Amino acid sequence: MLFIRQLSVIPKAPAFAKFFHTAGLVRQKLSDPNHLAILLQKNLAQRNSSLYNPELETIRCTIFDRHGNMQKPSIDLRRDELIHTHGLLPRDLRKVEKSRRNDLVPSVLVRENSILVSILNIRALVKSDMLILFDSMGIKLDSVSQQNFIADLQLRLQNRSGFEVPDVVNKDPLPYEFRAVESIFISAISNLNAELKVHLNVSTGILQDLEYSITRDKLRYLLIQNKKLSVFHKKSFLMREMIEELLEQDDVLCEMYLTEKQLGKPREEHDHAEIEMLLETYYNHVDEIVQTVGNTMSNIKTTEEIINIILDSNRNQLMLLGLRFSIGLLSLAGSIFIASIYGMNLENFIEEGNVGFPVVSTLGVILMAYLFAFSVKHLHKLEKVQLMSHGKSSTLK
């Protein structure tokens, strides 16, 4: 019976050996830097393909019709179909194909019959009777703010408000494309304002804490917050510059009237009051955000300069304290030197009288006091910091 049991165990041994061999290979691959780099590249490629699929050449998007209804939610459109159907250039879809959450550089590209908008995390193709919102149901437009944006976008495209009263005319006179662009700007500025409030609250709290005590952790938090404010300021500044460039180009503003171009009534070069007023309104909002962030960064910079002055002053005080201790030790060493000479086991004819000890002690004290006073006097001269000496000031006169 024992022999039979041993035979029944023998076939299981190769399975255990295979398992341990496989585990060893996996452990060896994970410890290999080249294998880890390959895994990282595959992961990044998989993430980048969430929006743009290079094999199928499709881009995920949501289409709104002329009535503001969501016609096709989260569909995949071919890249070449988008280019040929809507009169785009291949380079126009580069920003759309990126999978980053926030694109730092905003842009508004005006084409023959469409407007391609890329602001913060919103990328859309606006036409006179259609709006294509890229990646609307993907990883980026799944938050509460983006859901609110889609709801507000539908209301504006349908040309009605959320508090519309029956039997009362409450229509927006702006054309379809301007209502879509306005909704995108409103969502972008709302996101900027929300992010600004967070940065202001955090920065104000750190600055108030630094008024009571300066610690290493608080300085580290201040540095991190300053970096975040710099990125946010750059993002807001680029958005303001983009709107300002649009306002300076009269031909581009006239080309943004897609509905009138479709009706065969193109605008004159200087006849763009509606879109100009619309852009100026949001330019003022963005400019206010930029100025607020700039003032906060200026306050942080001023606080950093004051902290550096305080730390430099404390460091100088510590250095002066160390110098005073060194001066005291030097003076004491001078008196000890006199005493050591007196205490040598040599004939010096001073020991024969009774005045030797008082004389040596007096000389040691006098030497110690002289060295201390002389060193402290020169130290006080070094403490007095002047912009220019009397001789230089007299020559400058």
UniProtKB/Swiss-Prot annotation:
Motif (YGMN): 342-345
Principal localisation: mitochondrion
Keyword field: Ion transport, Magnesium, Membrane, Mitochondrion, Mitochondrion inner membrane, Transit peptide, Transmembrane, Transmembrane helix, Transport
Membrane topology of the entry: Multi-pass membrane protein
GO cellular component, one term: mitochondrial inner membrane
Residue ranges crossing the lipid bilayer per the database entry: 318-338, 355-375
A GO MF term: magnesium ion transmembrane transporter activity
Compartments where located: Mitochondrion inner membrane
UniProt-listed Gene3D superfamilies: 2.40.128.330, Magnesium transport protein CorA, transmembrane region
Targeting signal (transit peptide) range: 1-48
Keyword DNA-binding: no
InterPro entries with a match to the protein in the record: MRS2-like
Family: Belongs to the CorA metal ion transporter (MIT) (TC 1.A.35) family.
Record's function text: Mitochondrial inner membrane magnesium transporter required for mitochondrial magnesium homeostasis. Modulates the conductance of the MRS2 channel. Involved in the splicing of mRNA group II introns in mitochondria by affecting mitochondrial magnesium concentrations, which are critical for group II intron splicing.
Subunit structure: Forms homooligomers. Interacts with MRS2.
Protein name, UniProt field: Mitochondrial inner membrane magnesium transporter LPE10
Organism: Kluyveromyces lactis (strain ATCC 8585 / CBS 2359 / DSM 70799 / NBRC 1267 / NRRL Y-1140 / WM37) (Yeast)
